[in-house]
Amino acid sequence: PQIIPVKETGKKRAELQLFVFPFGIIYEAALRQEEKFPTVNISRRQNMNRTLVAYFSASGRTTRLAKALAGVTHADLREIRPAQPYSAADLDWHNPNSRSSVEMKDPASRPALGNNIGGIEDYDTIFVGFPIWWYEAPRIIHTFLESSDFTGKTLIPFATSGSSGMGDTDAILKKTCPDAHWLPGRRMNENTSAEELSAWVKELGL
């Protein structure tokens, strides 16, 4: 480095001071900004406010709606699969002895899951989709809700049905998972448009 003589002209010394001090000021300002705005854990911030669409579909109708909703909300999509898939005979609601009829007659029925939807702790908002069976959610939805800790999560039911309403579905699901924050569910057609889904999500304040 260049050695600057002790004796400098006033002009030369002024130039030196102008060169040194601004950098000192900038460095000090940067330190102050660092104290004012502490470092944020970026990986943690990226996991905040994540949304999941988890759904059960016996015939494929709810699948179409769930995919559309995931697209609108930019959410991850996971299917709730039964360990034993439902056949057409299982879904015959006219038959009181069909598998679905027997399950829905028993509030304690919990059909086994065929897959594990892990990582629930990474999500803040979870849409839970299903077809309406006997004016409420299929029993496997209760199995799903009891399979993980949803404490503090925002849960939003959505359902498909040709004509049946949701009945007391919201209240029944809340009893199964009381520590979650539930928003009102909605029954929709499998062909509900993206515009309608966006409007609904906006109504929810999400």
Residue ranges and their predicted role:
Residues 1-12:
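Extreme N-terminal basic, low-complexity initiation segments
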Residues 156-192:
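Short, glycine-/small-residue-rich phosphate/pyrophosphate-handling segment
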Residues 120, 146-152, 176-177:
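Short, conserved loop/helix-junction motifs that constitute active-site signature segments
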Residues 13-18, 37:
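Cationic, low-complexity basic patches in intrinsically disordered or flexible, solvent-exposed regions
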Residues 27, 38-125, 135-137, 142, ...:
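N-terminal beta1-alpha1-beta2 submodule of the flavodoxin-like/Rossmannoid cofactor-binding fold
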Residues 130-131:
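Glycine-rich, N-terminal phosphate-binding loop of Rossmann-like dinucleotide-binding domains
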